[in-house]
């Protein structure tokens, strides 16, 4: 299996998995044009589309792709039923694509119906988990997003986190504002800054590393707790997550 990233819009990535036979799976195609160009250039045969949630920058290209390749099966959560989904999937179910089983994980927060797809080592997490950050809470609650991130953080260490946006540099600037002396955060920030200066992608990331540099996955970390306690005493990790998310929204 080969993992490919297709840039779209200002900062989206459309992920494509292809096998040796050229069959491919497309994740969150917000725009059809760059996907069609990649299909043509690589001689791929699209077999399926995975949708993580209903936002236009993740579903906008579905109609055109299905018109061009009517054999495509479009998997998605209930909230994408009117966006071209032909196979609604929910938490605990599996999608069998390209000879692999993908587990469906409900991750409400960014939207209420958001889902992720996991087949070791690939995690397609849409706008739930970003490198160094997490999605904004457009529909869900901080508690829901905290629980969603906890689920994803529990996946195997070698999981490849395939996020849908290039937000890593701004996320790491925020992380530094919270934990300015953290060695892992400082090292990763320098690495990301160099990559982005060359206009290079920072994704996918390995989950084991992500747990060290993503403050939203470190709500039980004593260093972070001490920083938060300087401003306010919060007993529960969900409350500390909400504090972080509120800070990030204003950053």
From Swiss-Prot:
Cofactor note: Binds 2 Zn(2+) ions per subunit.
List of residues binding Zn(2+) 2: 57-58, 127, 165
Name the UniProt record assigns to this protein: Hydroxyacylglutathione hydrolase
UniProt gene name: gloB
Protein family: Belongs to the metallo-beta-lactamase superfamily. Glyoxalase II family.
Entry keywords, A to Z: Hydrolase, Metal-binding, Zinc
EC number: 3.1.2.6
UniProt: Zn(2+) 1 binding residues: 53, 55, 110, 127
Gene3D superfamilies: Ribonuclease Z/Hydroxyacylglutathione hydrolase-like (3.60.15.10)
Known function: Thiolesterase that catalyzes the hydrolysis of S-D-lactoyl-glutathione to form glutathione and D-lactic acid.
Signal sequence, start to end: none
UniProt xrefs under NCBIfam families: GSH_gloB, PRK10241.1
GO MF terms, alphabetically ordered: hydroxyacylglutathione hydrolase activity; metal ion binding
